């Protein structure tokens, strides 16, 4: 049986299936790794791409590596971040708003949360209340919040983009936020 390494598989995903799938695959390699492990994986991906120079789809693999991120926490965050990048939008990832709340993606004052259905399955009342308080607090600080589900991103990308731009327009009308987001926990 012939096998490939995980980095080679991620590169081949770019070559044969496109940048979006490859970014999700590459991002998944970084999860659960130490910073040293993440750097090692980036180097392995780059070396694999270099070895395949001149082969079909290597340019896509290079682009996917540029777009890959050690911060992504789910394949659907990776996918939507890549879609945003294709639209010319550079969202910030895993930003802290205040000391208690970290958000998936941030575009100006628009918070974009990618929520899996499992998060809500059989959710206890206390958890629902905690989530509601979190969202209310974020809005009270001047942020607009957009929730997207994986099934929406996959099957209604155009609808997600329409909702994104509508939410961004609302966010821009809110004005300045009272608690700026930071990349580190304050």
What are these regions (language model features)?
Residues 1-90:
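Phosphate-handling catalytic interfaces
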Residues 43-56, 97-111:
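Short, composition-biased local secondary-structure segments
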Residues 92-94:
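Glutamine-centric residue-chemistry signal
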Residues 96-101, 107, 111-186:
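Basic, glycine-rich
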